[in-house]
Swiss-Prot record:
This is Mitogen-activated protein kinase kinase 8. The gene is MKK8. Its EC number is 2.7.12.2. CDD domains: PKc_MAPKK_plant_like. It comes from Arabidopsis thaliana. The active site is at residue 167. The modification Phosphothreonine is found at residue 205. Keywords: ATP-binding, Kinase, Nucleotide-binding, Phosphoprotein, Serine/threonine-protein kinase, Transferase. GO terms for cellular component: cytoplasm.
Amino acid sequence: MVMVRDNQFLNLKLSPIQAPTTIPPCRFPIIPATKVSATVSSCASNTFSVANLDRISVLGSGNGGTVFKVKDKTTSEIYALKKVKENWDSTSLREIEILRMVNSPYVAKCHDIFQNPSGEVSILMDYMDLGSLESLRGVTEKQLALMSRQVLEGKNYLHEHKIVHRDIKPANLLRSSKEEVKIADFGVSKIVVRSLNKCNSFVGTFAYMSPERLDSEADGVTEEDKSNVYAGDIWSFGLTMLEILVGYYPMLPDQAAIVCAVCFGEPPKAPEECSDDLKSFMDCCLRKKASERWTASQLLNHPFLLHQD
């Protein structure tokens, strides 16, 4: 099945999926986080009540539902409450399942999940006061390194626990005034059950897809490339960081032009005026062959990140 998150490029109609009436129990254990305090609770903690949350404003609305800024009446803490659309489907189920699993300071935390008698589902999450990276443009190399390190820490955590995001882009990376950056939106993510379970299906946002995801049958795409299930996330990450650096999407925002550029052209590169370390970093993220792209773990040890300390 084909699913594209950004309909400005493709307008595809999917067969309707019958929504279940209740959330199924989580089939996977909560994953312990590295570098996280032992006091951090699991997602379904039952420590919150919807009645105890005051809605302050609407933060955004999309295919997955509406997100509100809310305040806990007891603690005065601010959170984001995602109200899933009534006709929630496998995309919503997938996001809920993954949110129940993950526990990392580099991934937007799920504090609780609520379901009312009518079946309406809401997810209480971290509130990131500066919104997404979508509005952030023209940063310094030092700022880019700080953001890149946090996103890669999150990617490394997810990949180590066999979760492929498949929709890394500026809109799905959230930031706070504390200089925190966290990965969000797991609607099209996938849990890799077997090490060779291919996740290069055509899902995510078209403009940020890697060559092997745009066309897995193209000349030069090997079985090794297809089985490298995590490399597509690295391409999307590299393109996202390059966009934030230069201040605009680095390719023509047209479907045919993107396919030609990504699948048949040279990979995007950092501007000439950038440092050699940054040029190398981008090259390691945006190699055409998936098998040649660096992993999140390798990129965390790249000189571009190490030399910014």
